[in-house]
């Protein structure tokens, strides 16, 4: 028997090890990886918190269960129920083991579930904003109330569980006793049996349940700030004047009832307990009836007047929660009185008008610049660079390896050879080639670079498509990039990766379920495995509590490619703030910068005023760095994120209204303008463009994220909403309100204006014939002083699966003028009736000569193409090129 007991503990440990084997392996690998990326302390924050919490919670559970058990044992000796445990210590030992296991299990479940809320509670940071009903700082609702709610749910659940298990234990032991004594089970004596077995214990538990019902209603009081019963989010008139009153009464009555219950137990009287429970139930029912009566017989007929203070609370706090309370609001009185000098003064804005559009450009990149089938461009980013001394807006994209496209897709190819992407492409947004394609300033492999931007190490080991692990510094050379005669190879010289010792090879073989880690003869001791290479997943693994933007973007700095990911702090706990997309508070409080070669991942705090990110910084020490610690050249490329701007625009459509009466009437609602991508195509919500512009009253151009607003369910544009991002202006928002008594064309109305123009419509119909299709580019509405300039690139796509859209024309509109032109410059000249190609250029003669030379060169290109088409018998192409030649010759007359 002793030998069996001696074997039990080792056997139990072995079973536990087998059951948690994969988790143990994963835990070891996580330690190695977090150590490699220098965030081991962040990883251990959770573990340390769980262990520290488990110890006192285990002691509380263990002692509480043991004391409850002991009290039942004492009652057992006075009861008819004989559980047979007093004759030896076996039952006590068995219960001790049971109690130990249950207490550890419950302590672990509680600690692993609520460690984060407890740390949030301990590291609470004030918002310095108080709710208007209970005058508590917002931090109470975000950092403290969630813990109170969790504790309430856990304790109530445990108390109810205790009641249920007590009844179950009684019935089991009673049945056992009856069977052993061969007596019949008498259901009539159950009431007496329960009282004698656990009457006082159950009464105490009932008193505690009533006590926590009181606490639960106190939580309900605080949760009134999230009420959705009124016309706006947050506590309404009925909530404050009826529901709140009854909740307070219930809190007091249930608190008294819990005390009465405990005193009644001591005196052995149970009638007062029944009375207290009855009163509590009556009050809960009465609260619902009273709230219904107040809402329907007092509020309903006077709602606008009675609800105004609460609507104002909702407006003020929603605007604060979504960072809309600091918007600079200006009237934009459209005069359309631009002169040539105004055009000259805004030359940089006009020179940066985007005629390349996202989707067609990405298609072109993926057909012309992937070089080999195993490369891909995941998406296109837009940014601003000083190129050869000029401030330019550009498109750029990283050329990544698409491992799913490899052929053959072997383990060596996927993980040892094709380890990284190579290079980037860049084109200015404002220029195209004579064929209507993006005009590259960086392209090809190895990079052909016409800029002053250095790109000396263009390898991409970490990116948006790098979803697999790779093993570097093996006996096989890594593929670097293709050449005509042979492939260029490379050895990884970065510091990322975990050394592949035999133990680590074994660990990863188990973790990845791949025997190749052990069988491969190419892996050396100095080889390293690089895991978690997807930049978003990498950031999430380090800081899973942040929300990440859907569009990471690349930056070229110090000869390498870096990735920037916007990280958000969000909550749905901000009082009185109306939820949008399941959140009612958001800040872009951090930027994540990731090195594409070394994988260095840095989190920079960009909003020091945000209490949530400061709470994270206190909780996860060593995670965040100051924004000033980021290189200046990286900071210059920080963008105002589109995901944040999108949700702010959605909220602003309703919450630009500050007057509660107007808000109640719903008479001034906005929505983001609609747009149309195809002639006679479906309409979609306009995608806010990043544009280079000079804001009114500013003396230099800057990059601005701009959205266009319509009146709800109308197409007339009513406002322009912009977010600034250059230098010290970063994060400043401005709202231009357009005159409501004028028809201001939105992107959609602009498209309708184009379709209704007989000359342009005729051209579009001609191009949109069978075999080709016209599609619109990205609509830009550019404010210049007190005027609006509309720009619409036109793309022509030939039939065929792999056809590439070409930017053939630009439509410009100003005031009542609408022109179809081959370029922005030509369109501006036509609108303002100037014969100069560059308006107000001081060196008019030289600039005209330069432009004439460039046009003559284009004319020669079209002439050569026309002759070539004539030789091939392609008369359609011949006609197109002759038309283009004619346009150019007409423009330089």
From Swiss-Prot:
Membrane topology reported for the UniProt record: Multi-pass membrane protein
Listed InterPro entries: UPF0182
Entry-linked Pfam families: UPF0182
Domain of life: Bacteria
Membrane-spanning ranges: 9-29, 49-69, 94-114, 154-174, 202-222, 246-266, 273-293
GO cellular component, one term: extracellular region
Alphabetical UniProt keywords: Cell membrane, Membrane, Transmembrane, Transmembrane helix
Location relative to the cell: Cell membrane
NCBIfam families reported for this sequence: PRK00068.1 (NF000825)
UniProt record similarity statement: Belongs to the UPF0182 family.
Protein name: UPF0182 protein CLD_0809
Taxonomic source organism: Clostridium botulinum (strain Okra / Type B1)
